């Protein structure tokens, strides 16, 4: 980055703006992504992101905001499970929370019916209610596993 670019970011107080944006995010990963944002200079990319923002705002106005409050970081747990490692009850409950969130967000999207530039993101979501329920029925709390598990 050039000195002029960095000076412009300071003058615009981008770090303060991004901190305010991060305060609105529901997950730690979301907060981190907000703080890491940088201005774009590609007109097509800017146009697409503006269209996505408009579409998301329209959905929120019509239906309210989808809930992401259950999202906890699970990437490390999934990587360990993929390598054959064992997961703790806490990790399994977090994964169940992510699966529940995916199911709820997919249902949120399905209610709309209007095509938007966000469709590609919603279509990538794959709920797995069977696994979600298997986890929640088997793990009673962070320290208690059901006898039938």
Show where each model-derived region lies.
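Conserved amphipathic alpha-helical "coupling/scaffold" segments
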Residues: 1-148
């Amino acid at each position: 980055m050039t000195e002029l670019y960095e000076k412009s970011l300071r003058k615009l107080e981008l770090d303060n703006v991004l901190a305010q944006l991060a305060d609105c995010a529901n997950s730690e990963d979301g907060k981190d992504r907000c703080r890491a944002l940088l201005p774009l200079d590609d007109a097509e990319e800017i146009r697409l992101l503006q269209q996505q923002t408009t579409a998301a705002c329209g959905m929120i106005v019509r239906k309210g905001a989808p809930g992401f409050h259950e999202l906890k970081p699970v990437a490390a747990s999934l990587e360990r499970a993929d390598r054959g490692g064992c997961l703790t009850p806490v990790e399994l409950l977090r994964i169940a929370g992510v699966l529940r969130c995916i199911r709820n967000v997919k249902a949120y999207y399905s209610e709309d019916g209007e095509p938007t530039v966000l469709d590609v993101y919603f279509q990538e979501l794959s709920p797995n209610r069977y696994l979600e329920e298997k986890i929640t029925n088997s793990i009673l709390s962070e320290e208690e596993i059901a006898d039938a598990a």
